[in-house]
């Protein structure tokens, strides 16, 4: 008789099964899913992608998102596919088609936040109904004990267009009934009322009905019985498990009973609906809203003017977006609920790899990536069937297995069974933590380095002078970024800064050594150190094993902050330094030590949004010297990439992260690769650029408006506009059509609001925005300007095409997995989202690929023809098709190949970069 299989053996078998089908993509193709591009649309694309040489389809988020979502990053239900994308049958048909062609499916996963303020998010609705006693209260990162007393045990909902009292008395907040449940509505938004507050409404109805129906009426008796049940519910502040279970059970029974009563008793229904109508008040009679005000004040949430969010919001958000609430996947039950369906897809082989969105928002990214891999193993074991025993024992066995593998392995490919890449933005010298259980980043580090190769670094001083002279100011990138961080922390993310400051102040009260530090002082040093941190975040999770990387960046931030603030006590900076590095744990009681670690983890979740909002979404729209460099993950203050630095990055990638993704355009980039390739040309023609600026400024001076006695747009925004126009002007166009005009207006309005100099999304200046819109239109309508502009544009466009083809070839040949963003296999002159989500003409791309196949025997002739007509984009598709075919024919060169920089000699040496790759007796030179 065979002995039973041990849990350890089952783990080993599951890992072996996953490893056997582990896919490292050969090349990925990113598709943006929405109601206009569904699973069926993607299925129709598969033969084209396969013919092009794509190995893995890469999908944007596919789980159920908020109604109307155009991007899918506002998931409201992780247990369902997004119905606007199609059915399960549609998705399975897509997965089957990929499998038939030996293609994989890489899925974009959003574990940091969910879309809320919509009834499609049942977890959030339950929190609004039940407050801290909701089973999902710990799913979201809510501070139920904020400093403001009125918000204790309540969540702030900053959704109102005006002050609460104004909105209330305008009659825009209305109670409605659905069956036996009550809600408050505000336009399309609908929030549940807590059952604790139902008696307020039902008691008066019962009293009124007694006179009409008589005390002995059975329906009135049932209503009073329901009232008693509701009054005996555990309050929403009672968080004991048994009370939560009782409340969840009994409130639903009470609502069902009320719904049944209303169906059989027209008098009760009529009386209740009349009471609701009275409760909703009459505009013009402020006192008529008093009862509704009392009812709303009894809810586990507080409706508020949207501007209140910056100062008082008490749930963690994705950046400053109120409609995206952070979730706590560090809690095992939350992780399982969020990833359950995803892991079933992985175990079944429907999904073969993952892209993780915004990992820097997570409590402990390193632990999360490890948990992803372990969860894939557990899901595989469950799918294999049989008795898996105790879940905790299984989890422990999986962890022990990987611990042993880590201790004995030399190659990470031998350890982790699931291909995972992370949307991690690295600074120029910042390494990706080597312990993370993944294959690398999504490629912004490559984008930055490769993009910079096409900028002439020797022209930096000249270009800086041109920029400074034109805008009549000398801007310092680091100073702008620092000030932008301070600004963001005093506006959009003020409430987050206040929350972690309060957290630390409460900790200091537990130590006689530190209790004299004031809240104001602590908030000040947290703000200054955060503003001085040169990276998105650190990854400290325990006093043991703090990396040299994290220690270096914390110490550097503290030193820089102290230097900038000589008037602030050094004791405060020293305390914060020791706290962030967990050096002072022994000076606190054990319970306080846990809170101190929690503060450090919260601070690390805070610094990433500060960096993103202040640098990517503010400074990048202010410092416009050469906006080809103003890209996600890039460093505009560094004018180009020296070839040695590019080679070093590739050497490090082939050694540490050989399967990391390589990106040149994404759904998040500020400009497409082709736009950046054009704008980079300006660095090689500074004299011509300066002369053009002078002519265009003179031609267009009269087209500006006047705002606050100053010309609008200002010269910095004008400088940005000319670069943008050169970047996006359609190939072969002799005038701007309405589509281009609308795109440029939309972009410039977004740019000036993101810059936050003259206008912003929070405080819009309509006069300035109207001046910008008018300027764009008048410039494009001016035949004299267009006539002067076109020769410069054509020259820039020609060399931009050369740049883009070279960049494309680099992406397809250096170490890593090349990713192609939808449509960029031919020229695509797109700007920031939503401009980069415009429809792609796949019929045109298929026709060009068919032409290449049809004339395959004359590749040299094709190359000459396409190069001679490069403006039509066929040359780019030809380069991609040729390079991907070469990759497929020589997989070892790209999976295991070495990377060796080559010295370039000759007159054009400074314009060339070369390298060799070797593996298994094969070699190639680029």
Question: Where do the language-model regions lie?
Answer:
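Alpha-amylase-like alpha-glycosidases and glucanotransferases acting on alpha-linked glucans and related
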Residues: 2-26, 30-36, 68-74, 79-106, ...
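Catalytic domains of carbohydrate-active enzymes, especially glycoside hydrolases
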Residues: 42-65, 341-353
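C-terminal amphipathic alpha-helical interaction region
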Residues: 807-808, 822-825, 908, 923
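Flexible loop residues that form catalytic
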Residues: 62, 359, 425, 825
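C-terminal RecA-like lobe
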Residues: 546, 831-874
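Carbohydrate-binding surface patches
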Residues: 875, 905-926
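Amphipathic alpha-helical
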Residues: 776-795, 873-900
């Amino acid at each position: 008789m065979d002995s039973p299989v041990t849990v350890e053996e089952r783990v080993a078998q599951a890992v072996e099964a996953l490893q056997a089908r582990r896919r490292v993509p050969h090349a990925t193709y990113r598709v943006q899913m929405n109601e206009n591009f569904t699973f069926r649309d993607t299925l129709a694309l598969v033969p084209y992608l396969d013919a092009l040489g794509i190995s893995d389809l890469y999908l944007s988020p596919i789980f159920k998102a908020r109604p109307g979502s155009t991007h899918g990053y506002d998931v409201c239900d992780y247990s369902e596919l997004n119905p606007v994308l199609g059915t399960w049958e549609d998705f399975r048909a897509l997965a089957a088609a990929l499998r038939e062609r030996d293609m994989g499916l890489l899925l974009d996963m959003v574990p940091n936040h969910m879309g809320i303020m919509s009834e499609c998010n049942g977890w959030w609705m339950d929190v609004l109904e039940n407050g801290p006693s909701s089973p999902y209260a710990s799913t979201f990162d809510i501070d139920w004990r904020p400093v403001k007393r009125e918000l204790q045990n309540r969540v702030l909902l900053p959704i109102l267009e005006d002050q609460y009292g104004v909105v209330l008395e305008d009659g825009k907040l209305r109670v409605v009934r659905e069956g036996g449940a009550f809600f408050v509505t505000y336009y399309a938004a609908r929030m549940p009322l807590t059952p604790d507050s139902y008696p307020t409404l039902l008691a008066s109805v019962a009293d009124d009905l007694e006179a009409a129906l008589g005390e002995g009426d059975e329906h009135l008796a049932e209503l009073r019985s329901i009232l008693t049940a509701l009054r005996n519910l555990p309050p929403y502040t009672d968080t004991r498990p048994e009370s939560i279970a009782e409340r969840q059970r009994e409130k639903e029974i009470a609502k069902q009973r009320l719904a049944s009563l209303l169906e059989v008793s027209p008098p009760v229904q009529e009386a209740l609906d009349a009471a609701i109508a009275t409760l909703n008040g009459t505009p013009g009679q402020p006192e008529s809203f008093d009862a509704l005000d009392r009812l709303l004040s009894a809810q586990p949430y507080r409706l508020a003017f949207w501007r209140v969010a910056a100062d008082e919001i008490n749930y963690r958000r994705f950046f400053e977006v109120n409609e995206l609430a952070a979730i706590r996947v560090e809690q095992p039950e939350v992780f399982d609920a969020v990833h359950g369906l995803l892991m079933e897809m992985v175990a079944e082989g429907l999904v073969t790899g993952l892209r993780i969105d915004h990992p820097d928002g997570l409590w402990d990214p390193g632990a999360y990536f490890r948990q992803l891999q372990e969860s894939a193993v557990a899901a595989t074991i469950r799918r294999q069937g049989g008795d898996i025993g105790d879940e905790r024992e299984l989890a422990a066995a999986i962890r022990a297995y990987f611990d042993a593998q880590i201790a004995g392995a030399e190659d990470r490919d031998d350890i982790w069974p699931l291909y995972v890449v992370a949307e991690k933005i690295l600074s120029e010298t910042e390494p990706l933590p080597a312990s993370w259980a993944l294959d690398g980043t999504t490629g912004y580090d490559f984008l930055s380095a490769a993009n910079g190769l096409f900028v002439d670094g020797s022209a930096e001083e000249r270009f800086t002078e041109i920029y400074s002279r034109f805008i009549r100011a000398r801007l310092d990138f680091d100073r702008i970024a620092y000030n932008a961080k301070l600004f963001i922390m005093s506006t959009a993310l003020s409430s987050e800064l206040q929350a972690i400051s309060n957290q630390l102040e409460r900790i200091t009260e537990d130590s006689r050594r530190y209790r004299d530090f004031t809240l104001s002082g602590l908030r000040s040093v947290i703000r200054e150190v955060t503003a001085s941190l040169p990276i998105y975040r650190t990854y400290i999770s325990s006093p043991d094993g703090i990396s040299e990387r994290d220690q270096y960046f914390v110490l550097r931030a503290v030193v820089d902050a102290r230097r900038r603030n000589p008037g602030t006590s050094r004791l405060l900076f020293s305390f914060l330094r020791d706290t962030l590095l967990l050096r002072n744990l022994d000076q606190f009681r054990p319970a306080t030590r846990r809170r101190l670690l929690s503060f450090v983890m919260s601070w690390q979740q805070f610094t990433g949004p500060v960096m993103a909002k202040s640098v990517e979404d503010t400074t990048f729209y202010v410092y416009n010297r050469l906006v080809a460099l103003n890209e996600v993950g890039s460093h505009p203050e560094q004018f180009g990439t020296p070839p040695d630095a590019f080679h070093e990055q590739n050497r490090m990638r082939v050694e540490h992260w050989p399967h990391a993704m390589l990106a040149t355009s994404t759904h998040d980039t500020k400009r497409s690769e082709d736009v950046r390739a054009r704008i980079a040309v300006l660095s090689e023609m500074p004299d011509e650029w300066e002369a053009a600026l002078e002519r265009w400024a003179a031609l267009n001076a009269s087209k500006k408006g006047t705002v606050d006695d100053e010309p609008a747009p200002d010269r910095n925004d004008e400088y940005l506009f000319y670069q943008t126009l050169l970047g996006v002007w359609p190939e072969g166009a002799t005038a701007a059509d309405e589509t281009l005009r609308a795109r440029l207006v939309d972009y410039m309005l977004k740019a000036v609001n993101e810059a936050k100099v003259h206008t912003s999304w929070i405080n819009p200046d309509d006069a300035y925005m109207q001046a910008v819109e008018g300027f764009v239109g008048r410039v494009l309508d001016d035949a004299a300007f267009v006539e002067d502009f076109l020769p410069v544009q054509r020259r820039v466009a020609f060399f931009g095409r050369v740049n883009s083809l070279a960049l494309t070839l680099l992406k397809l040949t250096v170490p890593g997995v090349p990713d192609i963003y939808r449509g960029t296999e031919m020229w695509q002159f797109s700007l920031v989202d939503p401009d980069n989500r415009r429809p792609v003409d796949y019929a045109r791309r298929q026709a060009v690929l068919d032409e290449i196949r049809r004339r395959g025997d004359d590749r040299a002739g094709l190359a000459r023809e396409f190069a001679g007509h490069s403006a039509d984009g066929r040359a780019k598709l030809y380069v991609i098709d040729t390079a991907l075919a070469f990759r497929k024919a020589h997989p070892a060169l790209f999976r295991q190949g070495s990377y060796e920089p080559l010295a370039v000699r000759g007159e054009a040496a400074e314009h060339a970069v070369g390298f060799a790759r070797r593996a298994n007796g094969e070699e190639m030179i680029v």
